[in-house]
From Swiss-Prot:
Family note: Belongs to the peptidase S14 family.
One Pfam family named in its UniProt record: CLP_protease
Protein name: ATP-dependent Clp protease proteolytic subunit 2
Active site: 101 (nucleophile), 126
């Protein structure tokens, strides 16, 4: 049974009374974005809009992107990726639970030195998948496009992890799961969060 979006109390600075706002808006006020579902156009548009707003509001101040996602659309994910690379603010990425496929790509795309994971997180990389129907010519066009996307993702993973392209290509041929510590050694993240800092 769905419970809806939780509401939390919030008091605007200088206001005498508290108002109730949904938890995601409260987190946005702290420059925290939560990707907790499959990456699709709708969630990508929301995340891009929030990142652009937060960057324009206070350029250079960190934005935190928490990721618990099984992956999703490559084109939607690339919209988030390009925005992360474009804005002035550093994007701190934190894996909570699972960062798979496009989720792991966005995790690795955080600002170098600020890519984190909780100790029991799982991270998975693999080649993009897709399917098509139609005439042989259309299928051939789709096949060329998915191979182009695969090359592009492999090159970007190699760039963000420091791994040789050949290793990335081998590892991404099938689902390749890692623990947080293994993801750190691989170069997908920079640090495993072992204890809460004050």
């Amino acid at each position: 049974m769905p419970i809806g979006v939780p509401k939390v109390p919030y008091r605007l600075p200088g206001e005498p009374y508290t108002q109730w706002i949904d938890i995601y808006n409260r987190l946005y006020r702290e420059r925290i974005i939560f990707l907790g579902k499959e990456v699709d156009d709708e969630i990508a548009n929301q995340i891009v809009a929030v990142m652009l707003y937060l960057d324009s509001e206070d350029p250079g101040k960190d934005i935190m992107l928490y990721i618990n996602s099984p992956g999703g659309s490559v084109t939607a994910g690339m919209a988030i990726y390009d925005t992360m690379q474009h804005i002035k603010s550093d994007v701190v990425t934190i894996c909570v639970g699972l960062a798979a496929s496009m989720g792991s790509f966005l995790l690795a795309a955080g600002t170098k030195g600020k890519r984190l994971a909780l100790p029991h997180s799982r991270i998975m990389i693999h080649q993009p998948s897709g399917g098509t129907r139609g005439q042989a010519t259309d299928i051939e066009i789709e096949a060329r496009e998915i191979l182009r996307v695969r090359r592009q993702l492999n090159e970007l993973y190699a760039y963000h992890t420091g791994q040789p392209l050949e290793k990335i290509e081998r590892d991404m041929d099938r689902d390749f799961f890692m623990s947080a510590e293994e993801a750190k050694n691989y170069g997908l993240i920079d640090r495993v969060i072992e204890e809460r800092s004050n």
